[in-house]
């Protein structure tokens, strides 16, 4: 059996411990490595000729990407999980206790357990490469750093900085890591090992303490000051998580107890809290999302199909969506993009949009001006069909007008090659209808981005009846290169995300018309776990956009999609939402941004002809909206719009911010129990009508007591 850790000795007395997990592209820590590492550490202790130790990775671009998450699924009880954490503590404590200097030479991802391993070393040096990132992202899986990270990190970089890293899971770039004292030096990769060896030869076992501001010294250096930090952090966490995520509060407690009662006590608390989180339903749900997205990355979207390489893209339309799509094509995918618009204003908008995003990166020192300019050079513009013939994919982002899209299809088939893919960014028009104008319908596909394009992770890849497998696979690969999470859905009104969102939004509108206040509605759904409430979302998306999509969904899918008639009054009053500074909420004059203290525009109640009454329980408000979404998600599965419950969960979480701690609509139905969900729907059906009728599959599952997972 191949070893993961190999120890070599240099003539100068420095030993090099290389980690290289056999058969894997990245290093991850596994429970079975414990005895192997302990044996090597014992060997080092016995060998008096070893003057220092350097830890380095044998992988090309990865130090240690973290612990192997699948280990956690093997834990049957909290006791098993606690033993796992304690095993890590023993090994890392042993490494830290070596009486020779130990230096971590870091290149590539150094995350989670990988950073905890580096923290147990006496010093750290990392490469200045863009691939090098350091962080503890465990909170994103509903966990906490369980290998001593909650104790060593605050002692190294300070409590405030450590809490910020652990509570957000943010990844730190090399220069930032040096500034905060997380690493002792940053050097080019070519001299990384040499520098680490020199540091080990210098014989220092402790690093210089990081300089702290006077305020930080006062806060972190006294029990009273530390309590202020912890209390403030706890308040912020409670506000942000709405009590839905247990990990952040436990992270704060680990640091608090460790700083008050010492490292040993802190490690004990860390192991206990880690164990509780591993077996929590929230972490199980978040880990299921992680595994689902990892699994999806290996799929082409069309079984047996090989994607063609996309060397050039054309984007039709220089508006908000077109500019965003062009931007992620050049900056993320590094693919040349040519933007075509009928007027120069649209083109300058697209260029300005991309430049502003890149310039933010320069201002934050994430890139140099030269890198920004090189990426901008990948974007070119035209008002005519010039320089488009060699495009591999054309993404259409023009108005939602079928005749216009038909014209675009004909233009592209005339101007481009026979294999050029025509991908429409429509949010509502069926792709099959757009493809009716094509002589090569196999090349036509939907590619539905969400706004703002650079922030929203999901894209829906929509195949109509004649879309070829190669077109699907190529489009999926293209979306992944843009940094997106693509789900393949079948053609149909609203596709998947907008279809399940529409009923949720409609129900919120019904509640509003029944007298629930706007603030109460939004607060109820934020408390449930959505990033924003439904009324805020309607203002953001645009009331006019909602009004345009609703009749299409009603025509194709039936009466349950009928939007409340009262909403026509909003458009008559020229209320489109944030885009024109007039919607449900008040907006600061001129910039269309919400007022600092977000306030409802009370005049909207008069426009709708309603008067807010007594607010219902938040849980009841949220339930009515959410069960509509759950019921429709199952209908989408039955209709073949989505291929699996897994895809439905990913689409809802990454497309509309369905609460990740619930694992997605299908995971949540399993948690509730199909029988319980059917009872809730039937109760509402009796009270409010057939829009709540449970779909056939849910009724079957309720009767047979079956689950999706």
UniProtKB/Swiss-Prot annotation:
For this entry, the protein name equals Fatty acid oxidation complex subunit alpha
| Pfam families the UniProt entry points to | 3HCDH, 3HCDH_N, ECH_1
> Which InterPro entries does the UniProt record give?
3-OHacyl-CoA_DH_NAD-bd, 3HC_DH_C, 6-PGluconate_DH-like_C_sf, ClpP/crotonase-like_dom_sf, Enoyl-CoA_hydra/iso, FA_oxidation_alpha_subunit, FadJ, NAD(P)-bd_dom_sf
Please give an example of a GO cellular component term from this record.
Answer: cytoplasm
At the highest ranks, the source species' classification is:
Bacteria, Pseudomonadati, Pseudomonadota, Gammaproteobacteria, Alteromonadales
Which PANTHER family does this entry report, sorted A to Z? TRIFUNCTIONAL ENZYME SUBUNIT ALPHA, TRIFUNCTIONAL ENZYME SUBUNIT ALPHA, MITOCHONDRIAL
Q: Which organism is it from?
A: Shewanella sp. (strain MR-4)
Query: Does the entry feature the keyword Repeat, yes or no?
Result: no
Where are the annotated segments for Enoyl-CoA hydratase? 1-188
Pathways per UniProt: Lipid metabolism; fatty acid beta-oxidation
UniProt cross-references to Gene3D superfamilies, sorted A to Z: 1.10.1040.50, 2-enoyl-CoA Hydratase, Chain A, domain 1, NAD(P)-binding Rossmann-like Domain
- Catalysed reactions, semicolon-separated: a (3S)-3-hydroxyacyl-CoA = a (2E)-enoyl-CoA + H2O; a 4-saturated-(3S)-3-hydroxyacyl-CoA = a (3E)-enoyl-CoA + H2O; a (3S)-3-hydroxyacyl-CoA + NAD(+) = a 3-oxoacyl-CoA + NADH + H(+); (3S)-3-hydroxybutanoyl-CoA = (3R)-3-hydroxybutanoyl-CoA
């Amino acid at each position: 059996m191949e070893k993961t850790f190999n120890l070599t000795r240099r003539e100068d007395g420095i030993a090099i411990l290389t980690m290289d997990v056999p058969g894997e592209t990245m290093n991850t820590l596994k429970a079975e490595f414990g005895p192997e590492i302990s044996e090597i550490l014992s060997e080092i202790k016995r060998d008096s000729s070893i003057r220092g130790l350097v830890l380095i990775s044998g992988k090309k671009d990865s130090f240690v990407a973290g612990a192997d998450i699948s280990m956690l699924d093997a834990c049957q009880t909290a006791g098993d999980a606690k033993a796992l954490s304690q095993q890590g503590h023993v090994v890392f404590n042993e490494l830290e206790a070596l009486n020779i200097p130990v230096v971590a030479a870091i290149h590539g991802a150094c995350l989670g357990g990988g950073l905890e391993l580096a923290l147990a070393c006496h010093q750290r040096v990392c490469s200045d490469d863009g691939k090098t990132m350091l962080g503890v992202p465990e909170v994103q899986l509903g966990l906490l750093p369980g290998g001593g990270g909650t104790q060593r990190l605050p002692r190294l970089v300070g409590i405030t900085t450590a809490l910020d890293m652990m509570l957000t899971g943010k990844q730190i770039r090399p220069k930032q890591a040096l500034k905060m004292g997380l690493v002792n030096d940053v050097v080019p990769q070519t001299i990384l090992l040499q520098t680490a060896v020199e540091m080990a030869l210098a014989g220092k076992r402790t690093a210089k303490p990081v300089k702290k501001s006077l305020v930080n010294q006062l806060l972190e250096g006294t029990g009273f000051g530390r309590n202020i930090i912890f209390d403030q952090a706890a308040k912020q966490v409670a506000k942000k998580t709405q009590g839905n995520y247990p990990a952040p509060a436990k992270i704060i407690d680990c640091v608090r107890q460790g700083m008050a009662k010492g490292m040993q006590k802190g490690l004990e608390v860390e192991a206990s809290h880690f164990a509780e989180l591993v077996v929590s339903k929230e972490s199980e749900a978040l880990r299921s999302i992680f595994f689902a997205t990892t699994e999806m990355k290996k799929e082409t979207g069309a079984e047996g199909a090989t994607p063609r390489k996309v060397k050039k893209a054309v984007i039709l339309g220089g508006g908000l969506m077109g500019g965003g799509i062009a931007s992620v094509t050049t900056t993320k995918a590094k693919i040349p993009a040519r933007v075509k618009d009928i007027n120069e204003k649209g083109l300058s908008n697209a260029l300005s949009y991309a430049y502003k995003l890149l310039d933010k990166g320069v201002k934050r020192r994430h890139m140099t001006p030269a890198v920004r300019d090189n990426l901008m050079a990948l974007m070119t513009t035209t008002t005519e069909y010039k320089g488009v013939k060699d495009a591999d994919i054309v993404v259409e982002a023009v108005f939602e007008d079928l005749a216009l899209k038909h014209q675009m299809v004909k233009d592209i088939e005339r101007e481009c090659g026979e294999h050029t893919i025509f991908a429409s960014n429509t949010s509502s028009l069926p792709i099959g209808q757009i493809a009716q104008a094509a002589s090569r319908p196999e090349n036509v596909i939907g590619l539905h981005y969400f706004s703002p394009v650079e922030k929203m992770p999901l894209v829906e890849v929509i195949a109509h009846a004649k879309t070829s497998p190669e077109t699907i696979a190529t489009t999926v690969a293209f979306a992944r290169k843009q940094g997106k999470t693509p789900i393949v859905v079948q053609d149909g009104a609203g596709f998947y995300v907008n279809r399940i969102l529409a009923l949720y939004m409609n129900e919120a509108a019904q509640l509003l018309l029944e007298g629930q206040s706007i603030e109460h509605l939004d607060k109820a759904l934020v408390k449930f776990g959505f990033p924003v409430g439904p009324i805020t979302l309607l203002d953001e998306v645009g009331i006019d956009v909602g009004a345009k999509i609703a009749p299409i969904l009603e025509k194709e899918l039936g009466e349950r999609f009928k939007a409340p008639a009262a909403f026509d009054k909003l458009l008559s009053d020229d209320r489109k939402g944030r885009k024109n500074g007039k919607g449900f909420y008040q907006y600061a004059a001129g910039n269309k941004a919400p007022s600092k203290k977000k306030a409802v525009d009370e005049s909207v109640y008069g426009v709708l002809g309603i008067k807010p009454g007594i607010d219902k329980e938040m849980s009841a408000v949220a339930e009515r909206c959410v069960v509509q979404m759950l019921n429709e998600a199952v209908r989408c599965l039955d209709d073949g719009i989505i291929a699996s419950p897994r895809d439905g969960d990913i689409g809802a979480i990454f497309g509309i911010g369905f609460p990740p701690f619930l694992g997605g609509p299908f995971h949540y139905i399993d948690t509730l129990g199909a029988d319980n969900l059917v009872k809730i729907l039937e109760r509402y059906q009796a009270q409010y009508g057939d829009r709540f009728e449970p779909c056939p599959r849910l009724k079957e599952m309720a009767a047979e007591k079956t689950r999706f997972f």
